[in-house]
Swiss-Prot record:
GO terms for cellular component: plasma membrane. Provide a mechanistic link between auxin and plasma membrane H(+)-ATPases (PM H(+)-ATPases, e.g. AHA1 and AHA2), and triggers PM H(+)-ATPases activity by promoting phosphorylation of their C-terminal autoinhibitory domain as a result of PP2C-D subfamily of type 2C phosphatases inhibition, thus leading to the acidification of the apoplast and the facilitation of solutes and water uptake to drive cell expansion. Triggers plant growth probably by promoting cell elongation. Regulates branch angles and bending. Induction: Induced by zeatin. Repressed by abscisic acid. This is Protein SMALL AUXIN UP-REGULATED RNA 51. Keywords: Cell membrane, Developmental protein, Growth regulation, Membrane. It comes from the Eukaryota. Its main location: membrane. Expressed in organ primordia. Hardly observed in leaves.
Length: 108
């Protein structure tokens, strides 16, 4: 009886270890939007955020200070009108990349 109980405990411990390894594997992977398991974008410096621009949804990292600029706020209004903010695509700016790069270079 004691042997069966010890064997059962060992199996339980092994199963827990396997489950722990499986769950930690998922944490190391990112999703298609380059986000970690908490939904935070990878490789984004503090004080910045990610936007996706144009038809090809090219990823740009921009400073948070842009949020106070009226020019950038217009882009956000366009994004809200076209996509809304309740979707799984990340913050998408509906303008051509050339226009976006030009605007952001002026804002810097």
């Amino acid at each position: 009886m004691a042997m069966k109980k010890a064997n059962k405990l060992t199996q339980t411990a092994m199963i827990k270890q396997i489950l722990k390894r499986c769950s930690s594997l998922g944490k190391k992977q990112s999703n298609v939007y380059g986000e970690d398991e908490n939904g935070s974008p990878l490789n984004v410096p503090k004080g910045h955020f990610v936007v996706y621009v144009g038809e090809n949804r090219v990823r740009y990292v921009v400073p948070i200070s842009f949020l106070t600029r009226p020019e950038f706020q217009l882009l956000l209004q366009q994004a809200e009108e076209e996509f809304g903010f309740d979707h799984d695509m990340g913050l998408t700016i509906p303008c051509e990349e050339v226009v976006f790069r030009s605007l952001t270079s002026m804002l810097r």
